[in-house]
């Protein structure tokens, strides 16, 4: 990269995005997230693999959703909208509320009661969004907001909004720009299924323009209790500790299937136990704290290595979609509890076992 300050994904990749010179860019300087080598993760699974972690939790609101939201909000402002609406398992609501605040728009978000991590809910609230907790699932909330957007002067900013995926594809551009090539495999958690579709779109556009010579195989991971694509059926009551991917009827289901099939990839499932084990492993082996949905990718890596699905010497990129601070409760439940000690040197040394 040059010494010029990072301008946000729209300005950085303007040539690849549906914007004009008159589009009012609403940005929090999202993007430019680190691609972190993970040698200890490789050592713990298959030492011949080159593993990199695309840490999207370092975006302004702590998740990959910011990439799509800068586009969705910018285009909403361009169209004259004064309000936006979304359904969310948490991260979309946080991003929508923040970017709407940045643009001076009203934001309305609907979340399933009891299914949104505290960190995400607090973000939407502090940014001034009107938050409604629905007595139902995410899929029911999405159906409601879609109907509202069809009949009222408010812009829908879920991933069914085509500008969302346009923004999210920039993560694939960054992977190539940082790695110097496309990976052999790209592993990603799948909830509403927009992100795996967006990455594939980005890789294909770079390939079309000769910026990469090969394309990765896209591998998606769903939680076992919320795996509609894997099971090829709508899950009426999805269940998983990974609330960000607790979705039973993904809006981008068809696009995700195309991405997987066209890239010769596949979709697999991981259990909550595997997710939480990988969640702790990622934090303790690589020093990276990401939310449980992100750990689905690491759990999938472990499972697929054991199954022999990756050729030795392959390069893998794993997308970690959101920061661990999004869901502090799960972290505290999964970690070693703090120990109380008297304020004395001997008591402290007795606990440290040095």
PLM feature segments, named:
Residues 1-354:
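PLP-dependent amino-acid enzyme catalytic core
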């Amino acid at each position: 990269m040059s010494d010029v300050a990072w301008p946000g994904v729209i300005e950085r990749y303007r040539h690849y995005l549906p914007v004009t010179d008159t589009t009012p860019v609403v940005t929090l300087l999202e993007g430019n997230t680190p691609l972190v080598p993970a040698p200890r993760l490789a050592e713990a699974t298959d030492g011949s693999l080159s593993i990199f972690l695309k840490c999207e939790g370092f975006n302004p609101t702590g998740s990959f959703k910011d990439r799509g939201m800068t586009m969705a909000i910018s285009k909403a402002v361009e169209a004259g909208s004064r309000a936006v609406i979304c359904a969310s398992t948490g991260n979309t609501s946080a991003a929508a509320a923040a970017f709407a605040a940045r643009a001076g728009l009203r934001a309305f978000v609907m979340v399933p009661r009891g299914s949104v991590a505290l960190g995400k809910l607090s973000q939407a609230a502090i940014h001034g969004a009107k938050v409604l907790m629905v007595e139902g699932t995410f899929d029911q909330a999405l159906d409601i907001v879609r109907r509202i957007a069809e009949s009222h002067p408010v812009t829908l900013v879920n991933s069914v909004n085509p500008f969302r995926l346009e923004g999210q594809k920039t993560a694939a551009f960054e992977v190539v720009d940082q790695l110097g090539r496309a990976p052999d495999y790209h592993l990603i958690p799948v909830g509403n299924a927009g992100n795996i579709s967006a990455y594939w779109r980005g890789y294909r556009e770079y390939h079309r323009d000769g910026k990469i010579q090969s394309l990765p195989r896209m591998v998606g991971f769903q939680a076992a209790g919320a795996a509609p694509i894997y099971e090829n059926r709508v899950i009426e009551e999805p269940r998983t500790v990974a609330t960000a991917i607790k979705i039973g009827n993904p809006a981008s289901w068809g696009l995700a299937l195309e991405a997987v099939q066209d890239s010769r990839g596949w979709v697999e499932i991981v259990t909550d136990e595997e997710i939480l084990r990988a969640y702790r492993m990622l934090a303790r082996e690589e020093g990276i704290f990401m939310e449980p949905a992100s750990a689905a990718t690491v759990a999938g890596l472990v499972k697929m290595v054991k199954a022999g699905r990756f050729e030795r010497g392959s390069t893998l990129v794993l997308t970690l979609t959101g920061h661990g601070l999004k869901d502090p409760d799960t972290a505290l439940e999964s970690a070693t509890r703090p120990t109380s000690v008297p304020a004395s040197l001997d008591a402290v040394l007795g606990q440290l076992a040095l």
